[in-house]
């Protein structure tokens, strides 16, 4: 089950994917990938997703940004254990756009599997860091909306 749908190949096919390799240090005392590693991977790979939707790698980040997504909330679901070593596929998809916020569904899959081991819904607020205020969602986010069917 990914993004709340059973057996939906459409969800996977319409999503952006990147990958990561687990590291020995990712393993906890129970012998599986530690729960904190999943969120760390998503944070690290989020830039790949942003580069993909904007089609570039040069834009202002951080406190110089006049239009960036600011993480407002996340809903996290741990589905099954993962053991090292393994290649992970990370899927991202914008599934909801409001006037000033949007949702990104993300799933982490063991390479070759169709069901995720972990999934999240991150809600971002479009934010101008220079003026320190929320702003309307950028057209690039709207153009990349792929609603769940």
Predicted regions and their residues:
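Single conserved hydrophobic/aromatic residue that forms the stacking wall/gate
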Residues: 1-12
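HotDog/MaoC-like acyl-thioester-processing domains
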Residues: 8, 78, 82-87, 94-149
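Active-site helix/loop of acyl-thioester processing domains in fatty-acid/polyketide metabolism
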Residues: 38-64
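Catalytic-site-adjacent helices and loops of nucleotide signaling machinery
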Residues: 35
């Amino acid at each position: 089950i990914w993004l709340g749908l059973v057996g939906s190949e459409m969800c996977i096919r319409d999503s952006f994917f990147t990958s990561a390799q687990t590291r020995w240090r990712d393993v906890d005392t129970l012998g599986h990938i530690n729960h904190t590693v999943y969120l760390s991977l998503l944070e690290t790979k989020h830039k790949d997703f942003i580069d993909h939707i904007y089609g570039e790698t040069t834009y202002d980040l951080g406190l110089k940004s006049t239009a960036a997504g600011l993480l407002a909330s996340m809903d996290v679901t741990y589905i099954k254990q993962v053991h090292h070593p393994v290649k992970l596929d990370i899927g991202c998809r914008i599934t909801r756009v409001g006037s000033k916020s949007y949702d990104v569904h993300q799933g982490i899959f063991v390479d070759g599997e169709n069901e995720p081991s972990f999934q999240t819904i991150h809600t971002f607020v479009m934010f101008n860091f220079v003026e320190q205020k929320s702003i309307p969602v950028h057209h690039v986010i709207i153009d990349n909306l792929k609603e769940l069917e």
